[in-house]
């Protein structure tokens, strides 16, 4: 069983992916992690990724898709796709790759949250620079103010979590990623979760209930 999580920045996709990995033993497909691994191994694809990143450019779909394809070839099912695909073209390429390895997306969960709530969540977010754990001054406060619950490292605010940058990210999401919702509505088991007033645990319980596991 493979699932996809869709939703705007700040909707809680990362938190749900973390829960699915920790509680239900799913494997998260992170294109960022996959690219960093290729770079650390100095592979041909890794060197290409590094070239684009050093220039401050997005790594082209063609390269990202090759890296994802390698991963899919050597991985069993029970995958979570979170943050990939971002565009319609990536989605179509992913379905072709999955088909090649006799895999498919079984469930697509769209976590829908109001823009004003998203902005408030993101601008209140703090992250641990060491373990990458995410906290929120509104919804997920650290046990000790300003410090990570897991390693006591001082929490920081991500540079792209400022109000102006959040607004740009939401606009980019609407232009590039919203079309995916219409696409997957007709291609997979599509489940929309209205999460404005739901806690992360309530969202997780809805997902778990749909998966029947």
Curated annotation (Swiss-Prot):
GO BP term, pick one: AMP salvage
Annotated spans, NMP: 30-59
Main location: cytoplasm
Record flagged with keyword Zinc: yes
Region (LID): 124-161
Pathway: Purine metabolism; AMP biosynthesis via salvage pathway; AMP from ADP: step 1/1
InterPro entries recorded: Adenyl_kin_sub (IPR006259), Adenylat/UMP-CMP_kin (IPR000850), Adenylat_kinase_CS (IPR033690), Adenylate_kinase_lid-dom (IPR007862), P-loop_NTPase (IPR027417)
Ligand binding (AMP): 31, 36, 57-59, 83-86, 90, 158, 169
Binding annotation for Zn(2+): 128, 131, 148, 151
Keyword Protein transport in annotation: no
Keyword terms, alphabetized: ATP-binding, Cytoplasm, Kinase, Metal-binding, Nucleotide biosynthesis, Nucleotide-binding, Transferase, Zinc
Entry superkingdom: Bacteria
Family: Belongs to the adenylate kinase family.
UniProt cross-references to PANTHER family, sorted A to Z: NUCLEOTIDE KINASE
Function of the molecule: Catalyzes the reversible transfer of the terminal phosphate group between ATP and AMP. Plays an important role in cellular energy homeostasis and in adenine nucleotide metabolism.
HAMAP family named in the record: Adenylate_kinase_Adk
Notes on the domains: Consists of three domains, a large central CORE domain and two small peripheral domains, NMPbind and LID, which undergo movements during catalysis. The LID domain closes over the site of phosphoryl transfer upon ATP binding. Assembling and dissambling the active center during each catalytic cycle provides an effective means to prevent ATP hydrolysis. Some bacteria have evolved a zinc-coordinating structure that stabilizes the LID domain.
Protein name according to UniProt: Adenylate kinase
Source organism: Mycoplasma mycoides subsp. mycoides SC (strain CCUG 32753 / NCTC 10114 / PG1)
Taxonomic lineage from the root: Bacteria, Bacillati, Mycoplasmatota, Mollicutes, Mycoplasmataceae
Primary gene name: adk
